[in-house]
UniProtKB/Swiss-Prot annotation:
Isomerase in keyword set: yes
Catalytic reactions of this protein: ATP-dependent breakage, passage and rejoining of double-stranded DNA
Entry protein name: DNA gyrase subunit A
Known role: A type II topoisomerase that negatively supercoils closed circular double-stranded (ds) DNA in an ATP-dependent manner to modulate DNA topology and maintain chromosomes in an underwound state. Negative supercoiling favors strand separation, and DNA replication, transcription, recombination and repair, all of which involve strand separation. Also able to catalyze the interconversion of other topological isomers of dsDNA rings, including catenanes and knotted rings. Type II topoisomerases break and join 2 DNA strands simultaneously in an ATP-dependent manner.
Organism this protein belongs to: Halalkalibacterium halodurans (strain ATCC BAA-125 / DSM 18197 / FERM 7344 / JCM 9153 / C-125)
Amino acid sequence: MAEQDQSRVKEINISQEMKTSFMDYAMSVIVSRALPDVRDGMKPVHRRILYAMNELGMTSDKAYKKSARIVGEVIGKYHPHGDSAVYETMVRMAQDFSYRYMLVDGHGNFGSIDGDAAAAMRYTEARMSKISMELVRDINKDTIDYQDNYDGSEKEPVVMPSRFPNLLVNGASGIAVGMATNIPPHQLGEVIDGVLALSKNPDISVPELMEHIPGPDFPTGAEILGRSGIRKAYQTGRGSITLRAKTEIEEHHGKQRIIVHEIPYQVNKAKLIEKIAELVRDKKIDGITDLRDESDRNGMRIVIEVRKDANANVLLNNLYKQTALQTSFGINLLALVEGQPKVLNLKECLEHYLAHQVIVIRRRTAFELRKAEARAHILEGLRIALDHLDEVISLIRSSQTTEIARNGLMERFELSYEQAQAILDMRLQRLTGLERDKIEAEYKELIERIAELKAILADHEKVLDIIREELLELKEKYNDERKTAISASEDMFEDEDLIPRQNVVITLTHHGYIKRLPISTYRSQKRGGRGIQGMGTNEDDFVQHLFTTNSHHTILFFTNKGKVYRLKGYEIPELGRTAKGIPIINLLQIEQDEYISTIIPIEEFTEDHYLFFMTKDGIAKRTQLSSFANIRRGGLFAINLREGDELHGVRLTNGDKEVIVGTRQGMAIRFHETDVRLMGRTATGVKGISLTGDDHVVGMDIVEDGQDVLIVTEKGFGKRTPIADYRIQTRGGKGIKTCNITEKNGPLVSLKVVSVDHDLMIITASGIIIRLHVKDISVTGRITQGVTLIRVAEGEEVATVARVDIEDDELDEDESIEEERDDRSEVEQGENE
């Protein structure tokens, strides 16, 4: 006995056996379980469920039957797996939130979008849906091949006739060994239009097909952001799209609330609500006062109550980012083509479906032709019998047996076995004249039908015409409205949309320290208060640039080297009111010998606003603001400077302003900005003022009605002169004298346009600072030398002058925010030569 057992033992290589067995298992999973067939869009389990229901007569026009009966039929005859797997698949086929077009018409509890499980199969009932009947239509007309079931006792279809492109219409998902498929559902009418377009133009491109099939259409609706992901998936077979819930913000009793009407595909509504509640509880999202689900049979409605002082749009953007209100859907158009897994693009999916339909129509036509020819053959025999009726009757009466009669008919009239048998089977009522006419009419129709069927088989275009006609009938019968919207924007919000919009004050000191404060910091005191300390600075430092803007506005920083940098308001650190700030070199990639000459806050880069540039050598340039909408992190050149030249200042204009320019030697010129034609960003510019000798520009400003021109000299002298004293000239001239330069007062250091509401900061080369009210400076004539503003010691000189709108050390509501006309506190830094 032991020897006999030993002889049955076979030694094998375990490594080779593992490879072989694993490959067999992998291919079994790929081909027989996890991946859909490109022709009918179904995996074996879906195909078996529908086939079993069709065989059981559970069609859409019949009564519902117990789900357990269907499951038993499937696992008993075709699908040797667990009953739960089959039932769960059938349940999904009956869920309107899982399938774009349900293939099973369920009766009872088939689960919900909240993740509730379906009732047990013994309680629920089902039948085929109307549209699933189109998948099995003509199945009994030899349109498909059959194969043995798992034990060879039954036959099952290899593929369904699938009279509509189910692979794209209902999509598919599945995980095989080493590969996975994830095909989104689509709108039936659009996919049919795509097939029709392909049938008319086999050379059609994927972009042209996308004119008919713009993108997926999910049963839960929602919105697809952008088209690039769709385009990539349709062209390559792989891609990713972003799905966002469909929401609206509505006013209710003076407050806002967010209403969610549709959620992304495959998102569990109950878990989504739990996640939002968890974020609120953990204080990761602020501003939600109430959350409830008001969904009913009329549709979905999730209500998110927003706190009165919260921004609903910012809150919604945070929800998009932190919850499943916005998800991504990875597309992988992987399907079985002739039994092999293949990644397909959109056109290939439709081509394989169309080729399948051509085969189905040709096989159906051939089947109908065989049937028609067989019937015509019988009718030919009946016609012969009717033409020789008396002789036929006599022959039959004289025959002893049916076999003798049949053989006699076959021999006498040269009939086939089938024809002779049909004559013997014919009832006597068929011998009447009326019945004879019916046979003749039927025979004539059959001859015409046979000719028609043969013509179809002989002409490929006729086959395509039939496919087109039947697809159009399906479209008319089952087409509905698209559920999922497709937005043109790739992503409707960025990180900045998660940041509340607020008005802020931004300061930059002479030594390059910058910070941001909420404007409420300066509005917390009552009128007439002493004010608060706005910032802590060193004794030799002061606020040189101070302006109000919005946290979402773009701040442009122009340097003496002609470069421009940009920051968003919220990118500047928010610090306490007494904090010094952080070095601006930590935020901008400026070089060691580079400094900020002008700061301009921009709300929007419009076409009707301009930037006016003035260099140290008197070169002027005017460029559209929109040219600076896209600035790299490392900055870019705003003006092409000549060798040795520097950018003195920049001003924002509306295209209808006047400019005044002052030079070190006391000359000034006033001209209209339109004298400088518009130029590109990289242009050098044109002559704004003619300079003599070693003269250079020390000031440039925009002329405002009712304001004065203020000049400060190297020896600390200064004066105010009415703007009207400076006549308008043409750009490029030498200008007119604005100050009588003497050894006593020295050359000009600064020229600015000021009002009585401004303050003036004057700093000497040794760091001594004095602050003056502009209203305290005398108004004198244009060619006078001015009065002493700051006393400078022998060998000392004024280095820099800054105009300040808001007093930094005594800011309160009355003396700060209201004095910030035009958000303008730009200050140019002069240099002592």
